[in-house]
Amino acid sequence: ANPICPKIPNPTIRISGRNDLCVDVK
């Protein structure tokens, strides 16, 4: 369970390890 990145309008998952990269989860 990765922390969700506060990004709008699409929910993104925060991946720790790569400068907290935010990936778009569709």
UniProtKB/Swiss-Prot annotation:
Transmembrane segments: none annotated. GO terms for molecular function: toxin activity. Keywords: Apoptosis, Disulfide bond, Glycoprotein, Toxin. The keyword Glycoprotein applies. Glycosylated. High-mannose type oligosaccharides. Lectin specific for galactose (Gal) and its derivatives. Induces apoptosis. Has cytotoxic activity against several human cancer cell lines. Is less cytotoxic to normal human cells. Disulfide-linked dimer of A and B chains. Cytotoxic activity repressed by addition of Gal and its derivatives. Melibiose preferentially protects normal cells from apoptosis as compared with transformed cells. The inhibitory concentration 50% (IC50) is 0.8 ng/ml for transformed cells and 10 ng/ml for normal cells. This is Aralin B chain.
